[in-house]
Curated annotation (Swiss-Prot):
Belongs to the MTUS1 family. The modification Phosphoserine is found at S373, S394, S415, S425, S429, S431, S434, S438. GO terms for biological process: regulation of macrophage chemotaxis. Keywords: Cell cycle, Cell membrane, Coiled coil, Golgi apparatus, Membrane, Mitochondrion, Nucleus, Phosphoprotein. Homodimer. Interacts with AGTR2. Interacts with PTPN6. Residues 425-437 have a biased composition (Polar residues). It is found in: Mitochondrion; Golgi apparatus; Cell membrane; Nucleus. Residues 106-401 form a coiled coil. Its main location: mitochondrion. The gene is MTUS1. Residues 411-467 are annotated as: Disordered. InterPro entries: MTUS1/CCDC69. GO terms for molecular function: microtubule binding. This is Microtubule-associated tumor suppressor 1 homolog.
């Protein structure tokens, strides 16, 4: 079955080439070798009858052994070929699946190509339509540009004509306004001069009143300040004199105490000296007695020993007495120092209290003086401010007078006291057809000047009066 022509490698090769899938097959590495083996086996099979015919003449044992070997070889070859055939079947199934996938991909690509062709056709048609529209739009744009140029030329000519007319109207208005404003300026100059003189007199009176009130308040403050300073000085001198008196009294009392203590100490010293003299005399008498006893008791050694012990005990007692005396002296000194220290501490506390009281008084006096100085500074600042305001007002009045004398004040605005008839008459007359039209160089400047003058003239009415 394995060596039949249906399953031979040559037939499989022919079928694959016929289908056109030989390129897609990827056989394993041992495929060509197996084909070569198959070809050699077939050739061996073709040649085997001849060899068998020759070998029939040999012994039957050799033939049986060779047949067994050949059978074993054929069996191994058959197993190998069956494995190769299975691999080829698997490769065929894989090739078929790949081919089906390729067909699906090709169909998909063809469908996409058809859609792309359809879109290309539609886009080409749209392009043709857009080109036609572009041509029409370009023609309309050219027409519109021509119309715009024509309109611009006509507009420029019209604007030039309007400018010429406007300039002529402006010149006429300037001449009329100049004629009108010259007469009005003369009237306003006279009115402003009269008002300026009135305000000047009023300001001078206010300034004189302010100076008088300032001088009187200054004198009053200086007098009160000097009186307060004198009172503070007197109080300070009185407190100092009282402190000095108390200090002298305490000093005298302390000196008296010292003198009394010195006298008591001197008495104690004299008493101690007399006691010391009596004790010395007693010691001398006792020594004489001791000497006499020693002379009498030279023969008794026990008595001598006892007398020596007595003398040593007396010496020890004397040393202890001296130490006790020194300690008493030290105690006396310590008591004196403690008493003096307590007295000094009391004096120190008293002086500290007095010093604190004096400091509190001085702080109060300093606070009062500072308050007075601040009040004086505030008054001086207010005076300076009032003087500056008065100077500014006087300068503004002088400037206004100078401007009025030089004739720079020419405006259609009326003053607070001027009548409204001169301003309404030219507007109602036929010589001024358009009251809202004004020259940009003449009217705003004059209006600003008149506004500044009216503001300067109304300042004195709202001037700051002193409190």
């Amino acid at each position: 079955m394995l060596l039949s022509p249906k399953f031979s490698l040559s037939t499989i090769h022919v079928r694959l080439t016929a289908k056109g899938l030989l390129r897609n097959l990827r056989l394993p590495s041992g495929f060509r070798k197996s084909t070569v083996i198959f070809h050699t086996v077939e050739k061996g099979r073709q040649k085997s009858p001849r060899s068998l015919c020759i070998q029939t003449q040999t012994s039957p044992d050799v033939l049986s052994s060779e047949k067994a070997l050949e059978l074993a070889q054929y069996k191994s070859k058959c197993t190998k070929q069956s494995g190769i055939i299975l691999q080829l079947k698997q490769l065929l199934s894989l090739g078929n699946t790949k081919f089906e996938a390729l067909t699906v991909v090709a169909q998909h690509l063809l469908s996409e190509r058809e859609e792309a062709l359809k879109q290309n056709k539609t886009l080409s048609q749209e392009l043709v339509n857009l080109r036609g529209e572009l041509v029409t739009v370009s023609t309309t744009c050219e027409k519109l540009e021509k119309a715009r140029n024509e309109l611009q030329i006509a507009y420029e000519g019209f604007v030039q004509k309007l400018n010429q007319q406007h300039q002529t109207d402006l010149t006429e208005l300037e001449n009329r306004l100049k004629e009108f404003y010259t007469g009005e300026c003369e009237k306003l100059q006279n009115i402003y001069i009269e008002e300026a003189e009135k305000y000047k007199t009023q300001l001078q009176e206010q300034f004189d009143n302010l100076n008088a009130t300032h001088e009187t308040s200054k004198l009053k403050i200086e007098a009160s300040h000097s009186e307060k300073i004198e009172l503070l000085k007197k109080a300070y001198e009185n407190s100092l004199s009282e402190i000095k008196k108390s200090h002298e009294m305490e000093k005298k009392s302390l000196e008296d105490l010292l003198y009394e203590k010195q006298e008591s100490l001197e008495k104690q010293i004299s008493d101690l000296k007399s006691e010391n003299d009596t004790l010395n005399e007693k010691l001398k008498s006792e020594e004489q007695k001791r000497i006499s006893r020693e002379k009498a008791n030279l023969k008794n050694p026990q008595i001598m020993y006892l007398e020596q012990e007595l003398e040593s005990l007396k010496a020890v007692l004397e040393i202890k007495n001296e130490k006790l005396h020194q300690q008493d002296v030290k105690l006396m000194k310590m008591e004196k120092l403690v008493d003096s220290n307590t007295a000094l501490v009391d004096r120190l506390k008293r002086f500290q209290q007095e010093n604190e009281e004096l400091k509190a008084r001085m702080d109060k006096h300093m606070a009062i003086s500072r308050q007075l100085s601040t009040e004086q500074a505030v008054l001086q600042e207010s005076l300076e401010k009032e003087s500056k305001v008065n100077k500014r007002l006087s300068m503004e009045n002088e400037e206004l007078l100078w401007k009025l004398h030089n004739g720079n004040l020419c405006s259609p605005k009326r003053s607070p006291t001027s009548p409204a008839a001169p301003f309404q008459s030219p507007r109602n007359s036929g010589s001024f057809p358009s009251p809202s039209i004004s020259h940009p160089d003449d009217l705003p400047g004059n209006q600003r000047q008149t506004e500044g003058i009216s503001a300067g003239l109304t300042l004195p009415a709202t001037a700051h009066h002193p409190p």
